[in-house]
Amino acid sequence: LSSWGSNEELQTFKSAFGQHFACFVKADHQRADGEVDHDNLLIRSDKNPNRRTARVLFGDAPLAFAPETDLVLVWGEGADFARLPRGVPVIFLNAFLAPENGHADVFFPISTMLERHGHFTNFAGATSAFAPCFGKAAGVVDAQAVFEALALTQVVATP
């Protein structure tokens, strides 16, 4: 799961799929070699604005796929596709052009935090709102809308 997802997106995912998926929180961004780890003002070692909420909702278990895994959903950048189980269909939600986009069986181009609104809860527990700086490109959708649509499909498909 994306540690850049908003509180609202993470909660929507949990409500829709938390009981159906084994969920693993990933760091979408890592500190670059030579980059300052942290300071006493602005720089934090965790480069992911909502990892705290993601871990509260989904835990911090290391990535491990069960042998019976039959579907993988990857949300956001930073996933190592080489670690995904072979031969298992992959749904990928990503906001950026990346080689992995073409390896997914289903790809959804999603918005960045600059194109949507929501809330993050930081490392200290403070919740802050963010708002769009500009509109989404044609064909781009918010991850929350994807999760809501897939959840609706799941309800309709259940006898």
Question: Model segments located where?
Answer:
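Non-catalytic alpha/beta scaffold blocks inside enzyme catalytic domains
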Residues: 2-159
